[in-house]
Amino acid sequence: MSGPELCPRPRGVRRGAALALVFASVLVTAAATNCLPQEQRPAALPAGSAAAALDPREGHTARGGDRTAEDVTRAAAEAQADGKSATRAAEEAVDRSGDRWGAVYDKGQYEQYTDALDGRYTGVGLWVARTADGRTQVTRVQSGGPAARAGVEAGDFLRSIDHWSADGRPVTEAVSRLRGDAAGSKVVVGLQRGSRSWQQTLGRAVLDTEDVAVQELSAEVVMIKVTAFTKGSGERVRAAVRRAPKDAGILLDLRGNSGGLVGEAVTAASAFLDGGLVATYDVHGKQQALYAADDGDGARPLVVLIDGGTMSAAELLTGALQDRGRAVTVGSRTFGKGSVQMPTGLAGGSVAELTVGHYRTPSGRGLDGKGITPDLPVTDRPLEHAKTVLSGLGGTS
């Protein structure tokens, strides 16, 4: 997924965001994301315990939950009955609703999105998001993937896909075109880096999302990088903490994490909390709570790295660790996406992801449009600053 903070304009952000999470050949956001970091700003339920599997993909906001769903469902059904595009009609209804995080996927796009949340996808190994001026920018390149082998870098602009202009177009559509056909098929992308523009032919492949990476920086420091909360990622974080050397501190890197499955973020929180509240949220006005399991490591030194690309479920985790006094946060202000979306099936097989509520941190903070301010704001060499802080907590010697 991408990353940002406060999207310049919700509408443009919305659709891209929704994809940043998806890792589609490019990302996925969305549903959790879009806006981009800082200058670009590029996303269930019943709770109760750590594993409360909130599958509502966090992320959108509407004028009124059930009413919006009814309007969108009716618009799609009427369009299909008239021989028109149900998906297009649903998109227009979402636009009218004012749900800045609402998104509509056709059947194929939604299947790709859900596949990505399972940790695998067919694509070229790119994550993208919409910039404030409407361009599509690469936010991450998967190591060892087709794009990485071809020399594509984060920060490059994606100008075209098989000669289709990506400028000013929905990120969801760009992602769909990048994913395109089966593994082994080819796609020609137009790229720009500074004054250089070129075209590159990439071969699609089945790739792992690689959402959790663990690196021992020293005997006293273990860094756990989480790029998105896909299925199983929370338990992988817990396993990494259990395997860490007894006296090592943890650097939890959530920079650029556009969100994902809320339940996985809660499970990740359980790695560092010995029970207790992680977040509260409302769905259609009904209040719920999410709790950590009671077997976490509550004593190990912990520093969390965040930035403008940290959003949604990643912000939920950050807010819990910060409010509970469990970690020191370092970096820059997070994106500010504190809403919850849930899917609504539509005529013709499309799916609308609509905002049904918002979540709050243990202290009651709402993050939507505000984000989280780090305990130590830094923009220059944040990792080095984080190591220094961890050393002061006793995580290094």
Q: Which residue stretches match the model-derived regions?
A:
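BRCT (BRCA1 C-terminal) domain core and associated BRCT-interaction motifs
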Residues: 329-330, 334-362
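Residue-level marker of beta-strand positions
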Residues: 146, 157, 186-188, 351, ...
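A short glycine-leucine-enriched loop at secondary-structure breakpoints
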Residues: 146-157, 180, 243, 320
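Intrinsically disordered, Ser/Thr/Pro/Gly-rich linkers and terminal tails that flank
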Residues: 1-130, 153, 168-216, 225, ...
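Cleft-lining beta-strand/loop regions that shape enzyme active-site pockets
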Residues: 182-336, 341
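PDZ/PDZ-like groove recognition
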Residues: 132-138, 223
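Conserved PDZ fold ligand-binding element
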Residues: 147-172, 251-253
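Second-shell loop/turn segments in exported
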Residues: 58-63, 75-83, 144, 160, ...
